[in-house]
Amino acid sequence: MTISISDLRKDYRQQSLSETEVDPNPLQQFQTWFKQAIEAEILEPNAMTLATLSREGKPAARIVLLKEVDDRGFTFFTNYKSRKGEELAHDPWAALVFWWAELERQVRIEGSVSQVSAADSDRYFSSRPWGSRLGAWASEQSKAITGREVLEQNLRALEQEYRDREVPRPPHWGGYRLSPTLIEFWQGRPNRLHDRLCYRLQGDQWQLERLSP
């Protein structure tokens, strides 16, 4: 059976999005949508695409998990020596995208990124499962290795080392917070005439505008 990619399409008809319905604060609006994504039992609603830039201006994107959102922004955790960590150290601006297909919704976010405090990183790290804490030590993220056995050998050694004591947070592992300057809410609509409401930070105030699809 031959599948024509160009024929793959879906007409979105679930909901609409109007300026009169949304919260004047986009972070509060995100919280509303995020709660609805959880209630819809979407698989990993906190999964988001993180896009960064290399020194040469080449983009890279990957899925990471949102671990906290508040009025300060969107927090995730990773290895500071990974490719994304190195790129954020060079250019601390990034973009996030959430895609909730079951709700026919997308949220796009742009902003500056900074490391969270060591205390915040310690607090989250200590909440992780034991194996995940060991994994943060076992893997030199984004580095080439000769085979999976390297990781498994590292893990076995760490299991012995920390069998009877707490696993500390590696100094090269911790959190980042993206402080948004732009948040766009996208709701799929019929005939590709989607609703797009975009908040832009002007000074300390959020300005809302509708974008043409």
UniProtKB/Swiss-Prot annotation:
Subunit description: Homodimer.
Keyword Signal attributed: no
Protein's UniProt name: Pyridoxine/pyridoxamine 5'-phosphate oxidase
Cited InterPro entries: Pyridox_Oxase, Pyridox_Oxase_CS, Pyridox_Oxase_N, Pyridoxamine_oxidase_dimer_C, Split_barrel_FMN-bd
HAMAP family linked to this entry: PdxH (MF_01629)
Catalytic reactions on record: pyridoxamine 5'-phosphate + O2 + H2O = pyridoxal 5'-phosphate + H2O2 + NH4(+); pyridoxine 5'-phosphate + O2 = pyridoxal 5'-phosphate + H2O2
Classification of source organism: Bacteria, Bacillati, Cyanobacteriota, Cyanophyceae, Gomontiellales
SUPFAM superfamilies given in the database record: FMN-binding split barrel
Family label: Belongs to the pyridoxamine 5'-phosphate oxidase family.
One example GO MF annotation: pyridoxamine phosphate oxidase activity
Native source organism of the sequence: Cyanothece sp. (strain PCC 7425 / ATCC 29141)
E.C. code: 1.4.3.5
Binding site for FMN: 62-67, 77-78, 83-84, 106, 141-142, 186, 196
Binding positions (substrate): 9-12, 67, 124, 128, 132, 192-194
Protein function: Catalyzes the oxidation of either pyridoxine 5'-phosphate (PNP) or pyridoxamine 5'-phosphate (PMP) into pyridoxal 5'-phosphate (PLP).
Listed cofactors: FMN
Pathway: Cofactor metabolism; pyridoxal 5'-phosphate salvage; pyridoxal 5'-phosphate from pyridoxamine 5'-phosphate: step 1/1; Cofactor metabolism; pyridoxal 5'-phosphate salvage; pyridoxal 5'-phosphate from pyridoxine 5'-phosphate: step 1/1
Pfam families documented for this protein: PNP_phzG_C (PF10590), PNPOx_N (PF01243)
Entry note: cofactor: Binds 1 FMN per subunit.
Alphabetical list of PROSITE patterns matching this protein: PYRIDOX_OXIDASE
Keyword terms, alphabetized: Flavoprotein, FMN, Oxidoreductase, Pyridoxine biosynthesis
GO BP field: pyridoxine biosynthetic process
